[in-house]
Amino acid sequence: MPIARRSLVVASAAAAALPAWAQPSAAEADAPALPRAGTPLPLAPIDRFDGSRFEPREADGRVLVLYWWASWCPFCALVSPHIEALWRQERGKGLLLLAPSIDREPQAARDYLTRRGYTFPAAWVTPEFQRALPKPRGLPVTIVRGRDGRVRQAEAGQLFPEDVMALARHLQ
């Protein structure tokens, strides 16, 4: 069998053997794409784990970092320490941060935050919040909303520590 044909057969067999779990869930496949820079980003109210309530008007005229995450997400585990560092370093300079968790149960997210000692403002995504502000495709998802209410930056997947810390440039 010629090499090109053999390679095609091997590649086809490998693709057919991919397990179902390697494919995105139906919900993830239907998730919206990341918003484009410059587009308006409407917000929705949500109860934070600390008992306070995030109201969209809090973000008026402020830079907001939205960080969707989950306790079971390995990439979130790599990014979250740097989100915490960003929060600690920049909150006094006007940074607003909201970290909605997509865990199935809010207690899993609360426990994770406690175990890791994270203090960044986090919440659990309720169906109402998801309808108003659907999580874009990917995880983690990090979106920076500028003072004017428009997307300044949107990223899906792991960010390097320097990329997370560079989000502070949007405060200038």
Regions found by a protein language model. Give the residues of each.
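N-terminal export signals
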Residues: 2, 7-23
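Short, internal strand/loop/helix patches
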Residues: 112-147
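Thiol-/selenol-based redox modules, centered on thioredoxin-like
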Residues: 147-172
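Short pre-active-site segment immediately N-terminal to redox-active cysteine/selenocysteine motifs
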Residues: 62-64, 69-72, 138
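Conserved hydrophobic/aromatic "anchor" residues
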Residues: 44, 68-69, 112, 120
